[in-house]
Amino acid sequence: MMRMPPFTLHTPASLDEALEIASNLQDAEKEFDWVAGGTDLLPNYKWHLNSKKNVISLANVTELFELKATHIGAMVRLHELVESEVVHPVLAKAASMIASVLIRRSGTVGGNICLDTRCYWFNQSEDWRESIDWCHKCDCGTEADCRVIPNQNTLCVATYQADLAPVLMCLDATIHLASSTGTRSMQLTDFFELDGMTRNKLQPGELVTHLTIPKDSAQWQGDYQKLRQRESWDFPEAGVAVMWKRNGVNAPNDIRVATTGLESIPGFHQSQAQHALEDWNGKESIMSLAESIRKAVKPVQNTWYTPSYRRKMTRILTKRACAGLLEDSK
């Protein structure tokens, strides 16, 4: 049986209280984690993956639960996205493909966006990691080498495998952050860091409060396609979101493409999408776009499927996600 290491649970009732607790822990030089739904953090704690002595629960921070068409709180549950009548249908579809019904009842939007990167050598029990002389991402105190790209201890290539980010990136979402020193916001496309250990631009003591989506998001159509081992459970081995906008003509006047499950960050493929718009030719342009996305992604051997297969499937997923472009032009 995998037992969680002991920790102190803090249960603030407001955002200000949560940030104050975080600030006090920092001043005392005590490490901590935020916990939202706990569907990722708590299993990692059972595996003794970077566990902390203090955990701050956001379950009672009501400011983070708001859900509107243009505002999605960090504590909104995934099943709420699926069932909502105001959420963009492509975002609702992506949410419906996350894990299982039970996990979607607990998992949150903020937790999915900030999902820890995953790797075959990292997401294992402590005994398993010890048997292969530890892992660079978790067991840094052992001076362990990276098991995916050996002989370098500067970069972690663990894979980002969350589903919501590519759709939200295509919807031009802005992510909003808060800490005891103030608030800030940035485009979601700028939030992620190309390192499996750093992961994103959250500073110590900072948390995600909500995401905002432009009011014109309803004008965008699209789809999200996902490759996984089991349809009812697994993280994406590859995921592709494609969104487009028309002005009553056959050719789209804008296209956005984003990917997940292929690198340490979700990819936003603006140049490939814009190139596809030039001299648009329906199916041929879609085939060219799909091939350019396949060439752009750089998966490594740290998930169940091989990098070559995931790249090939990225091309197929892109074509599938673009199917609506051909239907709309008929």
Language-model-detected regions and their locations in the chain:
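C-terminal structural segment of proteins
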Residues: 1-330
